[in-house]
Amino acid sequence: MLHVIKTQDDPMIKFIKDDPVRPEIPADWRVSKNREVLTLVDENKNPLAMVCVAFCDSIPSSVEELLTDAIAPNTAIFYTIWSYAGGGGKSLIGEAQQYIKDTYDHITRFVTLSPTTELAKRFHTKNGAKVFRQNSDTVNYEYE
């Protein structure tokens, strides 16, 4: 089941501390305007995987660009994802895309802001993404 975190009052926000990719991004920014944290939870509401999403009007090549506010967002940027259970990340990336398609008709693209690691490359390409752009410190993978 998908749980959407939109405010700092959500008890699930405490799991942001486990983010292994972008721990420097504060929790309050992750749930501010045009931003959400999507969590795959089990029947007991325990997190299985988490992904942070920013709705942007361009594709950022760096964290600095990610932090700018969008005027007319049309792209979902998955900028960090982590899992507490095997297969959780794969399930979450698919459910997250479907939720966004069903909820935000103005969002037409799904792109990552990923580290330049083999782990990120394997995860995203195995789950159907293609390299959109190689940047100096990041890679953008695009999902169809």
Question: What do these predicted ranges mean?
Answer:
Residues 1-31:
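Short amphipathic alpha-helix that is part of the acyltransferase structural core
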Residues 30-32, 86-87:
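Acidic-and-aromatic substrate-binding clefts and catalytic sites of carbohydrate-active enzymes
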Residues 34-37:
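Short loop/turn microsegments at loop-to-beta-strand junctions
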Residues 54, 142-144:
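Short beta-strand-to-coil "C-cap" segments at the C-terminal boundary of structured domains/repeats
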Residues 65-128:
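Acyl-donor binding region in acyl/amide transferases
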